[in-house]
């Protein structure tokens, strides 16, 4: 079965694995991991990037042919997130943005009220908005209604590696979405990424699971394989769960 492409807004991607860059020990290891992942879209925190720098992260992404996706990491209000997105548009010449508005540093949980406010303003300003949100199906629908090009619910808090805490919530978001659903945050290992795709997500975004692994390039390759396997399994259709056993070969 041929694997279809991930389509977000007016762009398509062969890979359904979106990478982040936070937590990488150095650019050399990050480069190996990005290559192993096969990703075509990678987030960069605009606050940590010198757009005029010489041999930095942006140069690496450009050399690898990977599209940078600026994010508003660190923003605590809609106003702050909007300003960061506007600066990213000027610096990187892109109207794509991963929107993050965080409530506090301890949980790194999205602030729903400020997130929706920022999304509304950025969509009105012509941005292609990919919001990092909670696993609340109502909030996901609200963000979609504002005109966001995708919704990106968390599996569990950023950097925890706890996997998908509420699989049913993710399924509800998928069932009601008319835009791509990208599982964002909480991935710890390859089975988490496969589960996200089996639940119906269109893509997975992860960073720490690779950058903080003992062997980042090897884990990146594992994540790429897991995302593909989970997607193909979802498309193929799993067998129904049964209470009693059923012989695979008939007795007669």
Curated annotation (Swiss-Prot):
EC numbers: 2.8.1.10
Pathway assignment reads:
Cofactor biosynthesis; thiamine diphosphate biosynthesis
List the transmembrane segments: none
**InterPro entries the UniProt entry points to:** Aldolase_TIM, Thiazole_synthase_ThiG, ThiG
Say what the protein does.
Catalyzes the rearrangement of 1-deoxy-D-xylulose 5-phosphate (DXP) to produce the thiazole phosphate moiety of thiamine. Sulfur is provided by the thiocarboxylate moiety of the carrier protein ThiS. In vitro, sulfur can be provided by H(2)S.
Q: Which PANTHER family match?
A: THIAZOLE SYNTHASE
Protein name per the record: Thiazole synthase
Record lineage: Bacteria, Bacillati, Actinomycetota, Actinomycetes, Mycobacteriales
Supply the gene name.
thiG
